[in-house]
UniProtKB/Swiss-Prot annotation:
Official protein name in the record: Small ribosomal subunit protein bS18
GO molecular function terms attached to this record: small ribosomal subunit rRNA binding; structural constituent of ribosome
Organism of origin: Burkholderia orbicola (strain MC0-3)
Pfam families in UniProt: Ribosomal_S18
Keywords: Ribonucleoprotein, Ribosomal protein, RNA-binding, rRNA-binding
Gene behind this protein: rpsR
Function text: Binds as a heterodimer with protein bS6 to the central domain of the 16S rRNA, where it helps stabilize the platform of the 30S subunit.
Quaternary structure annotation from Swiss-Prot or TrEMBL: Part of the 30S ribosomal subunit. Forms a tight heterodimer with protein bS6.
Stated family: Belongs to the bacterial ribosomal protein bS18 family.
């Protein structure tokens, strides 16, 4: 028996599941960013987890092109002491 599809089914499924995930989108593409700046620490902090790890693109929705730039920018900012390596270092 085929699974029910269509708008009605999708809305019902969203209402039933309180943990329904929204479609991810790339923040940098939406903003029209060409290069990610390592000096913009406020933006970079959004992509670092509680334990100091860089959040993967599959969780943030960032495109691969920007994820590579983001990775490099975070590493540069850490090297220049603009960002801490872990959350235990208070800056």
């Amino acid at each position: 028996m085929p699974r029910p599809t269509g708008k009605k089914f999708d809305k019902r499924r969203q209402q039933q599941n309180p943990l329904f995930k929204r479609k991810k989108f790339c923040r940098f593409t939406a903003a029209g960013v060409e290069q990610i700046d390592y000096k913009d620490t406020e933006t970079l902090k959004d992509f670092i987890g509680e334990n100091g790890k860089i959040t993967p693109a599959r969780l943030t929705g960032t495109k691969a092109h920007y994820q590579r730039q983001l990775d490099t920018a975070i590493k540069r900012a850490r090297f220049l002491a603009l960002l801490p390596y872990t959350d235990q270092h208070k800056a």
